[in-house]
Amino acid sequence: MKYTALIVTFNRLGKLKKTVEETLKLEFTNIVIVNNGSTDGTQAWLSSIVDTRVIVLTLTENTGGAGGFKTGSQYICEQLASDWVFFYDDDAYPYPDTLKSFSQLDKRGCRVFSGLVKDPQGKPCPMNMPFSRVPTSLGDTVRYLRYPGEFIPEANRSMLVQTVSFVGMVIHRDLLTTSLEHIHEQLFIYFDDLYFGYQLSLAGEKIMYSPELLFYHDVSIQGKLIAPEWKVYYLCRNLILSKKIFQ
């Protein structure tokens, strides 16, 4: 199997260096890094990397996470002979055994997986947990606030879910190729991954949450601005305002 890492970065050179360092230790066939118009010396540093697995795509402006992941996905689908693509940000990376764990998974009937993303304290990152059931109404949102366990998977139990996070998603290249249109650049940042995963679910794809696929995410805070309740509110609002996306 050929595995490709897809990383999007913007003006976080310090964290990117650690992400690349850890990624280079893993047996990826290719490592695609999308430089989203960084102005902090990122391009010069990326140009100094000598590992031939690394492919740098440089954009002239910041197109957001959605634009960066779409650019990288298009390149991978058109130019690389890869089987599976691992998505993550410039402040995240897979654990040392994640690729081995993925190779041992039963992939029959499933072309997209969502891993368990942990913060620096070793706790699950709420912002990267998928929804086992998307709250698409006001009633669902209220119930989610009271009973979140009805809408998100248990951290350490494999189960089917309805969304993904672009930190910790592993997707088959064939499925990615036919689903590029569902990475919506206009969303820029936040919810692009939720929309993408939910569209896959609506199309009948099985998304498996697999906690044995561990990712590290160097998030310094888990405050209100990135709490799941905040994401749910805007997700529901955007689902209502953007129904055409799912037609």
Enumerate the language-model features and the residues they cover:
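Active-site-adjacent helix/loop segment of glycosyltransferases
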Residues: 159, 202-247
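Short beta-strand-to-loop acidic/aromatic patch adjacent to the donor-nucleotide binding site
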Residues: 81-91
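Short, flexible, basic/aromatic active-site loop/helix in glycosyltransferases
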Residues: 133-162
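Short, well-formed alpha-helical segments that are part of the catalytic scaffolds
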Residues: 12-25
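A conserved acidic beta->alpha catalytic loop
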Residues: 35-44, 61, 92-93
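A short, conserved alpha-helix in the catalytic core of glycosyltransferases
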Residues: 163-164, 168-213
